[in-house]
Amino acid sequence: MRYLTAGESHGPSLTAIIEGIPAGLKLSAKDINEDLKRRQGGYGRGNRMKIETDQVIISSGVRHGKTLGSPITLTVTNKDHSKWLDIMSVEDIEERLKQKRRIKHPRPGHADLVGGIKYRFDDLRNALERSSARETTMRVAIGAIAKRILKEIGIEIANHIVVFGGKEITVPDKLTVQQIKVLSSQSQVAIVNPSFEQEIKDYIDSVKKAGDTIGGVIETIVGGVPVGLGSYVHWDRKLDAKIAQAVVSINAFKGVEFGLGFKSGFLKGSQVMDSISWTKDQGYIRQSNNLGGFEGGMTNGEPIVVRGVMKPIPTLYKPLMSVDIDTHEPYRATVERSDPTALPAAGVVMEAVVATVLVTEVLEKFSSDNMYELKEAVKLYRNYVNHF
């Protein structure tokens, strides 16, 4: 499976082309729109979420509610584009109109300045538009398709916020993936402990009032993963490495860990490694999951537990100092529309990219032209593992 996305934040639309989805997968626009709606939710989101109400158009690769095995084309219209017709015009326009929304005061923490230098832009909007988190709309759409495949082969995925701007959320022990999914979806701030709900909302309100932003830590958990996805044979086939790359590719993500993650560096080996046992009913199991479901770059049958660290959103309503790229004089950074936090939405994106990587790996191991063959291959493999 592979894909490309295209489109600018305030352009006419966003597009994705996905190749490698097996034929026979039940799929409708509704399946994708549900996740697009989740991405636009969460406490603290701004006015653009009220403008867009994203709806996907499937223009190829699906017929009568089932995939055809051919490339799937997805499009999401940017409803806000009607207000940007001159600024985002494909054709050349008058110089005075170009200057109307030109960006020359780069925002610290964004791609503005470095993108302008790299591509020789005198209007930093050219970098801003594509580097915007608006692009993640299509990655969520792609992830929605990936999750449909995972569900068909008994793999489920969920996410929740574990740290909100320095405030750590106490997570109840031994929650299942399904329980996490339900609890997180019932929370406006995507947490699984309702006793923290109002505290986090009040905190977001105070941050917004101060013109500031906050980041945090998001945890994604995947259950029902077969043993042996990924490989130890080559560095670039390690599945945890592929997931790490995908997570850090999300806008504003600055770190990733699995299981105990960085805490492992403060512990002894006897405190970290997961003891192995065997039962007739379950086969090989671990007595703990400190390694987050991975050994040697391969899944070991335990749930995948991966956390991503999201920095605070760089666009500040009380902007930091920057420089005018024309005069090189000190200047306040440009202010674009922004939110105090986007953690709940980022959790949906993280869930999507993890699902996409997993499906790509599944389709590589169990190469199948159609969903029937895929499900049979996975079933046969699971049976083999249970009797190893």
From Swiss-Prot:
EC number of this enzyme: 4.2.3.5
Quaternary structure annotation from Swiss-Prot or TrEMBL: Homotetramer.
Flavoprotein keyword on record: yes
InterPro entries tied to this protein: Chorismate_synth (IPR000453), Chorismate_synth_AroC_sf (IPR035904), Chorismate_synthase_CS (IPR020541)
Sequence similarity: Belongs to the chorismate synthase family.
Any one of the GO CC terms: cytosol
Enzyme type, top EC level: lyase
Cofactor binding summary note: Reduced FMN (FMNH(2)).
Keywords tagged on the record: Amino-acid biosynthesis, Aromatic amino acid biosynthesis, FAD, Flavoprotein, FMN, Lyase, NADP
Signal peptide bounds: none
A GO molecular-function annotation: FMN binding
Chain residues that bind NADP(+): R39, R45
Pathway: Metabolic intermediate biosynthesis; chorismate biosynthesis; chorismate from D-erythrose 4-phosphate and phosphoenolpyruvate: step 7/7
Keyword NADP: yes
GO biological process: amino acid biosynthetic process; aromatic amino acid family biosynthetic process; chorismate biosynthetic process
PANTHER family: CHORISMATE SYNTHASE
Needed co-factor(s): FMNH2
Protein name: Chorismate synthase
Residues that bind FMN: R130, S131, S132, N251, A252, G296, K311, P312, I313, P314, T315, R337
SUPFAM superfamilies membership: Chorismate synthase, AroC
Organism expressing this protein natively: Streptococcus agalactiae serotype Ia (strain ATCC 27591 / A909 / CDC SS700)
Function: This reaction introduces a second double bond into the aromatic ring system.
